[in-house]
């Protein structure tokens, strides 16, 4: 019997969610994703400290943000030596409400990849799914730079990304789960909210069905998993990005994996087509307390880790 990881790959593209490129090969994912927190975690390990030091030294005298981008691209290139597909590299979260600055930073990151001989099709630029981030991604896609819209918690964020022609979105399963669990407090029933009933799983499944029903080409990549049950409940999703710890658990199990998301069922679901302009997007996001809180919290956390990476580089 093959492992759950190999069975899952029959239904879904498996992506490694880590900056630790030495770990990736064991799981043979197609793609990999990084974010400021994962890069910070990697460079804090002795095995990766020389990579940070060498990159910073080679570009000493350049502006700090330019050196940071060099570090991100260095990690991305190392990852692309291991995976056959794409790597996602994130724009500084402190630019999440500045569309023009996000576009400029994304263009610079892509230019650095191209200077290393990496084709555009192998890179996704990660951007927080704020209104400004979505507009930046729309402009970038128009110029052939593909984007991965992250920190996605609300249905309106997903629909707006699809309308804007974004290549890929990353709805966050685990963080949605966390919010609902905390909000319920003592009333939370873990068993009743597991698998297909998990609020994070339900959110991704709703987005995936909507995109299939209306022929939206944006790829849906479930992210931020807390356990393998959440992952298996989304078998059939376009892509799932999974931490090395959970990849190892899937690799160690030979229990049967079944397709959970069905295209035919999606095509016949009762979803109604929606469209958002800036005003209706902001109102819909504001009406979703979970998404509003988690988006803000996520941007703050990534900004803190980006600032910490800045300090590490400045200290070299």
Curated annotation (Swiss-Prot):
<dbReference type="GO" id="GO:0005737">
    <property type="term" value="C:cytoplasm"/>
</dbReference>
<dbReference type="Pfam" id="PF00923">
    <property type="entry name" value="TAL_FSA"/>
</dbReference>
<keyword id="KW-0704">Schiff base</keyword>
<comment type="subunit">
    <text>Homodimer.</text>
</comment>
<keyword id="KW-0570">Pentose shunt</keyword>
<comment type="function">
    <text>Transaldolase is important for the balance of metabolites in the pentose-phosphate pathway.</text>
</comment>
<keyword id="KW-0808">Transferase</keyword>
<dbReference type="InterPro" id="IPR001585">
    <property type="entry name" value="TAL/FSA"/>
</dbReference>
<dbReference type="InterPro" id="IPR018225">
    <property type="entry name" value="Transaldolase_AS"/>
</dbReference>
<comment type="pathway">
    <text>Carbohydrate degradation; pentose phosphate pathway; D-glyceraldehyde 3-phosphate and beta-D-fructose 6-phosphate from D-ribose 5-phosphate and D-xylulose 5-phosphate (non-oxidative stage): step 2/3.</text>
</comment>
<comment type="similarity">
    <text>Belongs to the transaldolase family. Type 1 subfamily.</text>
</comment>
<dbReference type="InterPro" id="IPR013785">
    <property type="entry name" value="Aldolase_TIM"/>
</dbReference>
<dbReference type="GO" id="GO:0006098">
    <property type="term" value="P:pentose-phosphate shunt"/>
</dbReference>
<protein>
    <recommendedName>
        <fullName>Transaldolase</fullName>
        <ecNumber>2.2.1.2</ecNumber>
    </recommendedName>
</protein>
<dbReference type="GO" id="GO:0004801">
    <property type="term" value="F:transaldolase activity"/>
</dbReference>
<dbReference type="GO" id="GO:0005975">
    <property type="term" value="P:carbohydrate metabolic process"/>
</dbReference>
<feature type="active site" description="Schiff-base intermediate with substrate">
    <location>
        <position position="126"/>
    </location>
</feature>
<dbReference type="InterPro" id="IPR004730">
    <property type="entry name" value="Transaldolase_1"/>
</dbReference>
<keyword id="KW-0963">Cytoplasm</keyword>
